[in-house]
Amino acid sequence: MTDRVDINRVLMEIRSFKAQNQAMNSVQGVGNSLEGVNNTRGTQQVNGPRFGELLEQAVSKVNEVQQASGAMSQAYIQGDSNVGITDVMIASQKAGVAFDAMVQVRNKLVEAYKDVMNMPI
């Protein structure tokens, strides 16, 4: 009976990975829509990375973590002896935390954008 519960738990985690991967693919479009962020007029040029570049790097990093987690779970499913369930679960949790943080950043950006758009001129 214990083996059956463990199999169900693994299947549930696989479904969770799939859902996270699908959600991550929908968030990847955010990076593409940020191209206009760097177009500024009438502002002073400063040295260092631009906001859009930083945000794009963050989205890319979250994507890398998600891809690594998916690859690790796929390797475990295929029976790779070098990948343990604990490694898969840790990678999954890291990917989940990174994705949740990215969603919160996106929510704050949308909220800030709405605040700026609602400001009287």
From Swiss-Prot:
Q: What is its main location?
A: other
User: Is Chloroplast among this UniProt entry's keywords?
Assistant: no
Q: Name one GO biological process term.
A: bacterial-type flagellum-dependent cell motility
Localization: Bacterial flagellum basal body
**Which UniProt keywords are listed?**
Bacterial flagellum
Pfam families given in the database record? FliE
> What NCBIfam families does UniProt report for this protein, alphabetically?
fliE (TIGR00205)
- Family label: Belongs to the FliE family.
What protein name does the entry list?
Answer: Flagellar hook-basal body complex protein FliE
